[in-house]
Amino acid sequence: MNFELTSAYKPTGDQPEAIAQLTEGVLQGVPAQTLLGVTGSGKTFTIANVIANINKPTLILSHNKTLAAQLYSEFKGFFPNNAVEYYVSYYDYYQPEAYLPNSDTYIEKDLAINDEIDKLRLAATSSLLSGRKDVVVVSSVSCIYGMGNPSDFYKNVIEIERGRMLDRNVFLRRLVDSLYVRNDIDLNRGNFRVKGDTVDIFLAYSDTLLRVTFWGDEIDGIEEVDPITGVTTAPFEAYKIYPANLFMTTKEATLRAIHEIEDDLTKQVAFFESIGKEYEAKRLYERVTYDMEMIRELGHCSGIENYSRYFDGRAAGTRPYCLLDFFPDDFLLVIDESHVSVPQVRAMYGGDRARKINLVEYGFRLPAAMDNRPLKFEEFEEMTKQVIYVSATPAEYELIQSEGIVVEQVIRPTGLLDPVIEVRPSLNQIDDLMEEIQLRIEKEERVLVTTLTKRMAEELTEYLLNNNVRCNYIHSDVDTLERVKIMDDLRQGVYDVLIGVNLLREGLDLPEVSLVAILDADKEGFLRSHRSLTQTAGRAARNVNGKVIMYADKITDSMRLTIDETNRRREKQLAYNEANGITPQQIKKARNLSVFGSPGSEADELLKEKHAYVEPSSPNIAADPIVQYMSKAQMEKSIERTRKLMQEAAKKLEFIEAAQYRNELLKLEDLMKEKWG
């Protein structure tokens, strides 16, 4: 099946040319291209058009789970009839195993798995292995982390066909081999039940119930059934049932793995003893022996991923299997916000290795644990044959890889121009800033101020508050959820000014902001580099009155580059608007920060008011005074209710709301322990 792009809008401005150039590059086999698109120019819509033109499976890599969710929503809107999948870490909470030798502290692994995201991950791999070309997978950096061997996964796909001879009990055994669990009472995802000649399977990768009926040893019927009403939704002549888990293995592979693990255990224990590490030798022997007993009895153990190399049959030092192995060789990789995402991919291997070295050296894990890891950056590069880097400020790496193939997209369909940039002396900068703030307050517009230090952000906030300016600050010490709330309050008008350090850059969509003030703009460094200045200035690009003021005593190279580039873009944007009779239109957007917006939201936002997800005002349950007087039974009921609310929010992929409920849940559980132990 081919991609079918659904949109009420046609490409405008720079989009047609960008789409044509990128499409031609991919079809000609160009290994790397860069889409340099300014904020609000419709980069997602451009990429969607390219995907529809080339008709190849595509992986879209984002640097965090929330942005990935937004992209997933938008691509679902653009391709409602195609397979748009979502692949991110399925942990609601994850504390990795670690050992701190300085304090002799061992930290056990702790986690909570999001069942809904697990389903979406399985759906992604199932779509890729189905052989269809019209697959888009939106992923976080999780795509480079280890998972099961795709060939083992595919071997356990069950293909059935109406009229085919198949013993019912053989079919049931195959379901068990594919890690489905029989449950004739409570049928949930990944379970199956048997009633006479009818087998109902709740598929692990969808909300579908599959009903297979037998007539003796013949498959008599295959149909999808609504799991709630029991009504048949679609009959089938043939069907593929994909496994219920990404990590598949066989009994033979398990026995072989145990034998190899025990051999390596003997060698490592002997090594520790030879260098006088008797305690580490004893610890390792006890831990691995216990794990092997658990695997023999139950088929799994805590931390079984540290033995993945043995189960996969890989040699020491070889890379793990990952999501990229499920794609065909000719897939397209799109890296969103590449100036952030590429360094993140590069850093994953080093961080993981640093943590595991201590676990191996102090006898907590076998050396094979080092092979349960994310891809090295070089391995990632080898596996990606065609890449499009997407960024408003591509880094040197992307430009070098693209060999000069940079496709520019600076025209906004709304006609909005890049903000005017002014440079003013730092002498009396606060007094000057106060005057500018008052002008914006009169127009009911908002102001962002970026400082170099946390202390300065806090002191400036205090000064402005003393002068009756409604303001707040955000920096790395402010909790993530609190930051989101503060930014939402800025949009709602609770504050007129928001002050920050390095948090006013990528991903902040605040159309009400008409002024960005950059203090100490001439202090060269990471926070005042050309890339940082350009990203920060872009926060004023969604307002028709957008303006940037740089307070400085001199113009640095970074400032000059940012100013020159912004002026060049403004000239091009003005010329286009004049030639086409376009009057810049202020972006209108529902005043609430969207975590998982409506489908096609970017395309909608460019040309009309967007109906965004409105976050409910969730109560601070644990802080309610009545909680202190609850009985144990009432407290347990409140905990269970909060857990359900968290799970419902997570199921809708409303991560911020789910995280709020999770925090409330933890507070209630702590209160429960405090009162009743």
Curated annotation (Swiss-Prot):
All residue ranges annotated as the Helicase ATP-binding domain in the record: 24-412
Sorted UniProt keywords: ATP-binding, Cytoplasm, DNA damage, DNA excision, DNA repair, Excision nuclease, Nucleotide-binding, SOS response
Cell compartments where the protein resides: Cytoplasm
Main location: cytoplasm
Pfam families given in the database record: Helicase_C (PF00271), ResIII (PF04851), UVR (PF02151), UvrB (PF12344), UvrB_inter (PF17757)
Domain remarks in the Swiss-Prot or TrEMBL record: The beta-hairpin motif is involved in DNA binding.
Quaternary structure (record): Forms a heterotetramer with UvrA during the search for lesions. Interacts with UvrC in an incision complex.
Name of the protein described by the UniProt record: UvrABC system protein B
Species lineage: Bacteria, Pseudomonadati, Bacteroidota, Bacteroidia, Bacteroidales
Gene that encodes the chain: uvrB
